[in-house]
Amino acid sequence: MCTINAPHRHDTVGSFLRTERLKKARNDFEKGKIGREELTKVEDEEIKKIVDKQIELGYTSVTDGEFRRSYWHLDFFWGFNGIGHIHADKGYEFNGVVTRDDTAIVTGKISGENHPFVKHYTFLRDLVKDKRGVEARFTIPAPAQFYAELVREDKHVAALLKVYPDFKGLEDDIVNAYKTVINDLYNEGLKTLQIDDCTWGCLVDDNFIASFIEKSDRDKEVIRHEFAERFLNINNRVFQNNPKDLVINTHVCRGNYASTWFGQGGYDKIADELFGKEDVNAYYLEFDTERAGTFESLAKVSGDKKVVLGLITSKNPTLEEKEVIIARIKEASKYVPLDRLYLSPQCGFASTEEGNRLTEEEQWAKLRFIKEIADEVW
């Protein structure tokens, strides 16, 4: 199998709009009209189609579109031992909309043995093993995202304290569980792992930080950086000391639900921790709107780390002006050399099964557009 790792000059973030056939099958399964075996058969067939489409469009680091998931993150959390699926007091609050209220909660000691996502990866691996120059890339949510979910509401904290008398024990088991899953994925052939992370997208938002100031008289920047160091520590404990030929990239998100968002603010507020200290190979970064700030913070990207510029929105079907995108790439190259820059959508097209507000053909038009620009620039 190809070991050429992402990112590539033209790239994707990973999730794609669920096909109508897949949506119907999932709905039929939830209503008891079909069984798990039949649903899996449909998933397998639709994943093969989405992989073939990515290759047809010239994308060589393919994903399964996250077609087996309802959420980009929760399905993975539910796959751990010691984690239950319950309903939160309310869904995540996005700009003008509230999501479904599913969540994950501690029910016992957390561990990562026999995680179902390993089989999800091996199916994808086998689809491309004979396709020269194509790699199977796999996406999972960040360890810090898992931690944040487990302390989301008072009832989450009450549940975890029954198992973990202190948060250090919780963090240790999160790290060990992730290490187990990553090791299992690697042993099955994975060479490129993408870590999706909305925690940074929360920390850049002053409104998020303000919710904690109400409970404390400390300065908001002190609170922000305390969170940043905690999230950084959890992530880096997982990202470090892995096999040398395993590439770990991360995607930073400000929310992507039905074409809406939850966070706003530039990267400068957490650039020292995120860009200076997080131990990853590349960053997939949102830069499609003013909510993401300017490029100056990219000067903090340490070492020879790469930056994938998410300049093309996945939230609506409108194609940006090519000249504007090329000019923005040139502007970003003032802070990170052009040979370490790449281009992608700002996020996936369907971080949850609802998907964003565009059609499949409009989704593909976005990918054609990205490749066209990348071919011209690089």
Roles of regions detected by a PLM:
Residues 1-378:
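Domain-level signal for soluble alpha/beta catalytic cores
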